[in-house]
Amino acid sequence: MRPETDSESYCLGERATEINPTTGMRVDLTGPSVEFLTSPQETGTDFCLLRGVIPPGVSVPLHSHPDTEDFIVISGEGQALRQGTGGYEWIELKAGDHVHVPGNAPHAWRNTAGAPFVSFIITTPKLGKFFQEVGRPIKSTDQPVTPEDIADFVARFQSVAGKFGYWNGTPEENAAVGINL
């Protein structure tokens, strides 16, 4: 019940809440990975909360989608690529920084530091479903990724991205912004 006082109070609703909830599902995106803190199938919500990890030396290639995303960096250092009036530019990010990516804005990420780049990602359930469909579930007994795994992932990624209406930069477009695929 909400107290009837002048002090600050927050109504969390009548449904039970959890502190630090997670679905336990983590998927590998052939380098970067995401952990689902909320399920994209959850009803009654218009967002999906993820914890994203980009290992040292790894990039997320140039892409865009109609879904908005907000990133809150929780540890590590990295860079985000944005398209400005003068073309593409990399911006430096560190723990505590927030990045808003509007729908259909071309963007990319890279970790140029020696530790994982970790962020909370607030996005749409649709993008969460995309990650579920394209990612490889992470299990504690997973074997290292092989070149065949990467080739299979790239083919599946392109197919699923097309189904969702997402755009991915070509190898040439990525090379032009400093990402070598």
Task: State what each model feature region is.
Residues 1-47, 147-181:
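A short, N-terminal "cap"/entry segment at the start of jelly-roll beta-barrel domains
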Residues 33-37, 48-64:
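Conserved short histidine dyad/triad with adjacent acidic residue
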Residues 38-39, 59-65, 82, 90-91, ...:
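Short histidine-centered beta-strand/loop micro-motifs
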Residues 42-43, 70-72, 84-103:
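Short acidic-glycine-tyrosine-enriched beta hairpin
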Residues 56, 66-79, 83-84:
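Glycine- and acidic-residue-biased ligand/ion/polar-headgroup-sensing regions
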Residues 79, 103-129:
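Ligand-binding loop in jelly-roll beta-barrel domains
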Residues 129-149:
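A hydrophobic, small-residue-rich beta->alpha segment in the mid-to-C-terminal subdomain
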